[in-house]
Amino acid sequence: MTSVLIERIEAIIVHDLPTIRPPHKLAMHTMQTQTLVLIRVRCSDGVEGIGEATTIGGLAYGYESPEGIKANIDAHLAPALVGLPADNINAAMLKLDKLAKGNTFAKSGIESALLDAQGKRLGLPVSELLGGRVRDSLEVAWTLASGDTARDIAEAQHMLEIRRHRVFKLKIGANPLAQDLKHVVAIKRELGDSASVRVDVNQYWDESQAIRACQVLGDNGIDLIEQPISRINRSGQVRLNQRSPAPIMADESIESVEDAFSLAADGAASIFALKIAKNGGPRAVLRTAQIAEAAGIALYGGTMLEGSIGTLASAHAFLTLRQLTWGTELFGPLLLTEEIVNEPPQYRDFQLHIPRTPGLGLTLDEQRLARFARR
C-alpha cells in the first residue's frame, strides 16, 4: 500500500487582525491587534490540514515571534518533513524534535495541521485521534483587561447577562500593588457569587509582594492566582503554593513537558495551565496533563490568544481530559473582529461547543485570508 506523503508545508503570517477592545492590557504587553501564523500542510492524496502558531506581543511573552516562526518553518522544519508519510505523526514530530531545539509554537502548528489532515482523511474529529472526547463542550473564562474598574465591571455584567461567560480573569501586575488589589477587590465585590474571579500576574510580583497580595486576594474571594512570581524563582513558588489561601497556577513556569514534571515533583503549583503552543502540540500537552493528574494537580486549559484554528486545536485536546477542574480560557476568537474560517467557533451558555466534524472542523475563507495574509 502506497503511503500518503507530505507534499508541501506553507507558513503564512496573518497580519494585524483587529481586536474588539484595543487596548487589551497585559502586564508585559498592550495589544492593539493580533498576528497569527497559519500553517497549511498539503498531502499527496489531495487532503490539506491547517494549523496555527500564535504568540502574544511578538517576543514580549515567549521566545518565538510570528516572523521567526515562519522563517524557521520555511528554512528548516518544512524541508525536513516534505516527502515523509503524512499519516505517521509520531515519526514526523520525532524528526522535528531531533532537528530543532525548542520552537514549540512552530511545532505545535505543524502537528495540529497533520492531525487535521489525518482526521479529514479518516472522517474523524481530532479529539478521536487523541483517544476520544469525554465531553462535547468546555467552560470558557473571559479576560477583563481594560485596566478601568468601572468598565471591567460593566463588561463582566454584560457577559453574565448574555450567558457568554461567568468566569473572569483580571490581568494585573503592571500597576502599583495597592492599585491592582483595589481594582480586583472592587470587581469581585460588585460581581459577588454570580461569577468566579481570578487574577493573572504574568510573573510581575516579587516574592514579598506576592506574600501580601495572595493573602488579600484569597481573603476577598479570589479563586485562583496565576503565575504571581518569576518562573526562575522555583523555591519562592513552592513557598507561595504552601501559604497562599487561594490556589496558585503555573503558566510561564511550564515551557515543556519536562518543566511540568519538575514543578510537580517540587510541589510548586496546585494548578497547571495547559497550552499546546508551549508544549509543542496537542499530543504533547496531553503528556503534561498526565503528569499533573498523576501528581494530583488540577488542570486549566490556557490560550495564547489564538484565532479559531489554534483554539479548536486546543479544544480537541482538552475534550479528552478526564479532569479539567478550572475550565478553559479559549476565548481568542471572540477577541478578534475578523475571521479567516468559514465556521467560527460556537459559544453559548458559558461554553465553547466543539462539533464532531472531521479534523478540526474548519475550512479557510480564502478571500478573507487574502486580505490579511503576508507570505
Swiss-Prot record:
Pathway of action: Aromatic compound metabolism; beta-ketoadipate pathway; 5-oxo-4,5-dihydro-2-furylacetate from catechol: step 2/3
Keyword field: Aromatic hydrocarbons catabolism, Isomerase, Manganese, Metal-binding
Family matches, as PROSITE patterns: MR_MLE_1, MR_MLE_2
Signal peptide: none
Pfam families on file: MR_MLE_C, MR_MLE_N
Keyword field contains GTP-binding: no
Residues at which Mn(2+) binds: 200, 226, 251
Reactions that this protein is recorded to catalyse: (S)-muconolactone = cis,cis-muconate + H(+)
Cofactor: Mn(2+)
InterPro entries, sorted: Chloromuconate_cycloisomerase, Enolase-like_C_sf, Enolase-like_N, Enolase_C-like, Mandel_Rmase/mucon_lact_enz_CS, Mandelate_racemase_C, Mandelate_racemase_N_dom
One GO term (biological process): beta-ketoadipate pathway
This enzyme's EC code(s): 5.5.1.1
Record-level Gene Ontology MF annotations: chloromuconate cycloisomerase activity; manganese ion binding; muconate cycloisomerase activity
Classification via Gene3D superfamilies: Enolase-like C-terminal domain (3.20.20.120), Enolase-like, N-terminal domain (3.30.390.10)
Active site, per annotation: 171, 329
Subunit structure: Homooctamer.
Protein family membership: Belongs to the mandelate racemase/muconate lactonizing enzyme family.
NCBIfam families: mucon_cyclo
General function of this protein: Catalyzes a syn cycloisomerization.
Protein name: Muconate cycloisomerase 1
